[in-house]
From Swiss-Prot:
The lineage of its organism: Bacteria, Pseudomonadati, Pseudomonadota, Alphaproteobacteria, Hyphomicrobiales. This is DNA-binding protein HRm. CDD domains: HU. Gene3D superfamilies: IHF-like DNA-binding proteins. SUPFAM superfamilies: IHF-like DNA-binding proteins (SSF47729). The keyword Ribonucleoprotein does not apply. Transmembrane segments: none annotated. GO terms for molecular function: DNA binding; structural constituent of chromatin. GO terms for biological process: chromosome condensation. Histone-like DNA-binding protein which is capable of wrapping DNA to stabilize it, and thus to prevent its denaturation under extreme environmental conditions.
Amino acid sequence: MNKNELVAAVADKAGLSKADASSAVDAVFETIQGELKNGGDIRLVGFGNFSVSRREASKGRNPSTGAEVDIPARNVPKFTAGKGLKDAVN
């Protein structure tokens, strides 16, 4: 499912216009992104948790040349599925 399909499904289930559903989906994504950017976590009971993890610097290899390259440390988004979501897909 892509974003347009998600918007259409939200519009159908919530009885919204596609424009309103698109605004709602965008607002949810922007809110999650903003909270993670500010170092916060989002905990949605029964669905899952969004958080930020720190990936330390490491050494890697260029697969074409075999040359060693430095991979800098960075923050990466992380999602952990909750029990309700895990149960729903099994």
